[in-house]
């Protein structure tokens, strides 16, 4: 177990014994079979995508096609930001002709993007949200990318990607990249959760924290209380509870990755419940909530839709949505207890 202190890398270590992301992944893979060694190269490509996106974001306001909307809507019916398009294309570009992945599936695309020349040898699928919280770009707040890796289980000759419609325990790796004051990559391949900070002078992600453990309980509750009257009564009951009791503080940035990173480091709970308008929630299971659930569970936390463990949910379509309750074990259980209690009272 490690204490979740702020990231700090001694200056002298950068010259001598720093651990880069690629080196760390290779060390993690020593206990894996030889078939899994491609994960190191895949993680390096994800890191490259993160570097390219971070560079673009650093020039927001100084160059065209970074801020604002494209005027189009995506498969979710949402207005598309210019950075959404750029980031999605970056992920596709860095994996083309890599021989590593056969498919890329993104919340920005109706169907997976196939790379035929990779398919004979690329045994993996990359699932990702290229830019989470893209509305924050125009006001210079943090945004992020979310990713997960799954092993392809059939030839998918009809292009329907049915093998992706399985629970989140089929993920073999997951993580996120947070673009803020520094660019941070957090990942897990099922051997703990590890964080890396991008050193711009080296162009490398450097290990900052290893084997991160989320506190069992934390002071943070993170949710958009502007939706209060659209929530189920159980979630309103929970919100009233934290308002009445000392020791809780609200933090919400509008970027899922930023809020989850705070919860991971400081403890607490993030909630994105269903609403009257969207009872199934807004967040996508295979691109957002399942990858984050994989990561948080690896850190000793808990994630559910309020009733069912998120990693046990089987979607019936690629863009399946789900509510999200995620964070410290005690805090997630508290939210779940309000939901269970309300359901019990409704049945009586």
Swiss-Prot record:
<dbReference type="GO" id="GO:0000287">
    <property type="term" value="F:magnesium ion binding"/>
</dbReference>
<feature type="binding site">
    <location>
        <position position="129"/>
    </location>
    <ligand>
        <name>Mg(2+) 2</name>
    </ligand>
</feature>
<dbReference type="GO" id="GO:0006002">
    <property type="term" value="P:fructose 6-phosphate metabolic process"/>
</dbReference>
<comment type="pathway">
    <text>Carbohydrate biosynthesis; Calvin cycle.</text>
</comment>
<keyword id="KW-0963">Cytoplasm</keyword>
<keyword id="KW-0479">Metal-binding</keyword>
<keyword id="KW-0378">Hydrolase</keyword>
<feature type="binding site">
    <location>
        <position position="252"/>
    </location>
    <ligand>
        <name>substrate</name>
    </ligand>
</feature>
<dbReference type="GO" id="GO:0005829">
    <property type="term" value="C:cytosol"/>
</dbReference>
<feature type="binding site">
    <location>
        <position position="288"/>
    </location>
    <ligand>
        <name>Mg(2+) 2</name>
    </ligand>
</feature>
<feature type="binding site">
    <location>
        <position position="131"/>
    </location>
    <ligand>
        <name>Mg(2+) 1</name>
    </ligand>
</feature>
<dbReference type="Pfam" id="PF00316">
    <property type="entry name" value="FBPase"/>
</dbReference>
<feature type="binding site">
    <location>
        <position position="132"/>
    </location>
    <ligand>
        <name>Mg(2+) 2</name>
    </ligand>
</feature>
<dbReference type="Pfam" id="PF18913">
    <property type="entry name" value="FBPase_C"/>
</dbReference>
<comment type="similarity">
    <text>Belongs to the FBPase class 1 family.</text>
</comment>
<feature type="binding site">
    <location>
        <position position="282"/>
    </location>
    <ligand>
        <name>substrate</name>
    </ligand>
</feature>
<dbReference type="GO" id="GO:0019253">
    <property type="term" value="P:reductive pentose-phosphate cycle"/>
</dbReference>
<dbReference type="GO" id="GO:0030388">
    <property type="term" value="P:fructose 1,6-bisphosphate metabolic process"/>
</dbReference>
<keyword id="KW-0119">Carbohydrate metabolism</keyword>
<keyword id="KW-0460">Magnesium</keyword>
<keyword id="KW-0113">Calvin cycle</keyword>
<dbReference type="GO" id="GO:0005986">
    <property type="term" value="P:sucrose biosynthetic process"/>
</dbReference>
<comment type="subunit">
    <text>Homotetramer.</text>
</comment>
<feature type="binding site">
    <location>
        <position position="224"/>
    </location>
    <ligand>
        <name>substrate</name>
    </ligand>
</feature>
<dbReference type="InterPro" id="IPR000146">
    <property type="entry name" value="FBPase_class-1"/>
</dbReference>
<feature type="binding site">
    <location>
        <position position="129"/>
    </location>
    <ligand>
        <name>Mg(2+) 1</name>
    </ligand>
</feature>
<dbReference type="InterPro" id="IPR020548">
    <property type="entry name" value="Fructose_bisphosphatase_AS"/>
</dbReference>
<dbReference type="GO" id="GO:0006094">
    <property type="term" value="P:gluconeogenesis"/>
</dbReference>
<dbReference type="InterPro" id="IPR033391">
    <property type="entry name" value="FBPase_N"/>
</dbReference>
<dbReference type="GO" id="GO:0006000">
    <property type="term" value="P:fructose metabolic process"/>
</dbReference>
<dbReference type="GO" id="GO:0042132">
    <property type="term" value="F:fructose 1,6-bisphosphate 1-phosphatase activity"/>
</dbReference>
<feature type="binding site">
    <location>
        <position position="107"/>
    </location>
    <ligand>
        <name>Mg(2+) 1</name>
    </ligand>
</feature>
<feature type="binding site">
    <location>
        <begin position="132"/>
        <end position="135"/>
    </location>
    <ligand>
        <name>substrate</name>
    </ligand>
</feature>
<dbReference type="InterPro" id="IPR028343">
    <property type="entry name" value="FBPtase"/>
</dbReference>
<protein>
    <recommendedName>
        <fullName>Fructose-1,6-bisphosphatase class 1</fullName>
        <ecNumber>3.1.3.11</ecNumber>
    </recommendedName>
</protein>
<dbReference type="InterPro" id="IPR044015">
    <property type="entry name" value="FBPase_C_dom"/>
</dbReference>
């Amino acid at each position: 177990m490690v204490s979740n202190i702020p990231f700090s890398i001694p200056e002298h270590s950068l010259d001598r014994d720093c651990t880069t992301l690629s080196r760390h992944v290779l060390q993690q893979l020593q206990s894996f079979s030889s078939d899994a060694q491609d994960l190191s190269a895949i993680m390096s490509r994800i890191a490259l995508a993160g570097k390219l996106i971070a560079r673009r974001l650093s020039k927001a306001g100084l160059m065209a096609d970074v801020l604002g909307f494209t005027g189009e809507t995506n498969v979710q019916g949402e207005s598309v930001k210019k950075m959404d398009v750029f980031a999605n294309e970056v992920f596709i570009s860095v994996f083309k002709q890599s021989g590593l992945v056969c498919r890329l599936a993104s919340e920005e695309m109706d169907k997976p993007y196939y790379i035929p020349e990779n398919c004979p040898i690329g045994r993996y699928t990359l699932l990702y949200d290229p830019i989470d919280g893209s509305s924050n770009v125009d006001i210079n707040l943090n945004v992020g990318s979310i990713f997960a890796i799954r092993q392809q289980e059939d030839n998918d000759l009809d292009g329907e990607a049915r093998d992706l419609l399985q629970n989140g325990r089929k993920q073999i790796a997951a993580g996120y990249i947070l673009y803020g004051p520094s660019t941070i990559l957090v990942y897990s391949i099922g051997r703990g959760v590890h964080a890396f900070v991008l050193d711009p002078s080296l162009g490398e992600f450097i290990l900052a924290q290893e084997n991160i453990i989320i506190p069992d309980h934390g002071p943070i509750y993170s949710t958009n209380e502007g939706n209060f009257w659209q929530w189920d009564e159980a979630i309103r009951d929970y919100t009233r509870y934290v308002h009445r009791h000392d020791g809780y503080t609200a933090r919400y940035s509008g970027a899922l990755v930023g809020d989850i990173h705070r919860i991971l480091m400081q403890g607490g709970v993030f909630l994105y419940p269903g609403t009257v308008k969207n009872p199934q929630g807004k967040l996508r299971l295979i691109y957002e909530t399942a990858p984050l659930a994989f990561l948080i569970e690896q850190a000793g936390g808990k994630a559910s839709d309020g009733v069912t463990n998120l990693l046990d949910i089987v979607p019936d379509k690629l863009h399946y949505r789900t509510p999200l309750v995620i964070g410290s074990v005690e805090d997630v259980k508290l939210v779940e207890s309000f939901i269970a209690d309300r359901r019990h009272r409704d049945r009586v």
